[in-house]
């Protein structure tokens, strides 16, 4: 198990000079707040944050979903996600276990956010020229 939630890894913490994203709101590209960061998922081999675990708002299912770090931009007060809209967090693929992620689950999650980069809105689907 290479990538695990911080709750299982007591020896890891966010560096004091960095902003701790736990508790920050997460918003989609449309500015709609989708939920709040509840946990960090750590890659133990490389000692980096790979995912934010988000608790979505009740109108978006009230589920816990993962947001890949590389699809996130951490601001002063919120985390912005350019690839999908706020309401699209409701359909992020889930995990079978709350304490581990499989390679297939990683692929599905990355594909969901990556696909949103091209298909989240009708405007993104058309050619630029």
What does each model-found stretch correspond to?
Residues 1-129:
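Peripheral interaction segments used for macromolecular assembly
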């Amino acid at each position: 198990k290479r990538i695990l939630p911080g709750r299982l890894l007591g020896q890891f913490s966010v560096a004091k000079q960095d902003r701790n994203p736990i508790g920050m709101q997460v918003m989609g590209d449309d500015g709609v707040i989708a939920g709040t960061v509840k946990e960090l998922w750590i890659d133990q081999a490389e000692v980096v944050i790979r995912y934010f675990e988000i608790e979505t708002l009740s109108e978006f299912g009230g589920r816990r979903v993962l947001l890949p770090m590389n699809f996130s931009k951490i601001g002063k007060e919120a985390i912005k996600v350019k690839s999908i809209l706020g309401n699209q967090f409701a359909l992020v693929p889930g995990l079978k276990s709350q304490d581990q992620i499989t390679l297939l689950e990683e692929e599905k999650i990355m594909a969901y956010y990556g696909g949103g980069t091209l298909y989240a809105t009708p405007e993104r689907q058309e050619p630029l020229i």
